[in-house]
Amino acid sequence: MDALSPTWPDLAHLTWPEVARAVAEGADTVILPLGATEQHGPHLPLGTDTLRAEALARRLAARLPGALVAPALPIGCSDEHAGFPGLLSLDAATLAAVIVDCARRMAAWGVTRLVLLSAHGGNGQALALAVERLRRELPDLRVWLPAQTLAPDDAALAVAAEAGIAPEEFGLHAGEGETSELLWLRPDLVRAEAAEAGYRGAMATVVDTLQRLGLKAVTPNGVLGDPSRARAARGERYLDARAGALAKELLA
């Protein structure tokens, strides 16, 4: 299970003099994790994407000199999950405005690079809007939106393939991939006895449908994939593989 470490400098745990000293000593980067509050099948908590975003951000910060991790934004753009109780969601323009407002304040106290790290694919439109505005309104702030944060990345899928986990099992939502990661991060929040397969076809073929009609049109239980073979140890490997790929992309 993950625990906080001095190598994962959470901004919210620092005092203002500590932040000032960190910036003076070269901490010029902030990683802003973006999650969601939405259903993740009958077995995972609504905050799954937020927990995953925080974990990825900390792992990425450990690989990036001078990086601080901002508190995760726990509500994203999740209207495709309408019909499942517990949903909290923002319009894309609202989330983009929140990101821009936070970035302005960061730039004012010395941040010169912002990493937008989303663990929820539905945040894509808001992130694109935010990046467009930031590049126009804060040209001195370098903004990085990783290509691999909006979908299962090749690094995690490679780990799955080594274990004999097919992409249809790994899934796009609450499948083996996310369930394994939550078993590593917060096993106390996983209702393993309730885990069951959902849609298990080719994931790429349903993306358009779920974006237009919502997940309920594709999977009544909210699962895209099959969590039955999820394992905590593999979840740790997924997270490390994702973070390594992100760091490689950023440092290229």
How should these model regions be labeled?
Residues M1-V115, A119-A252:
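Extended, histidine- and acidic-residue-enriched regions that form the cofactor-binding/catalytic faces
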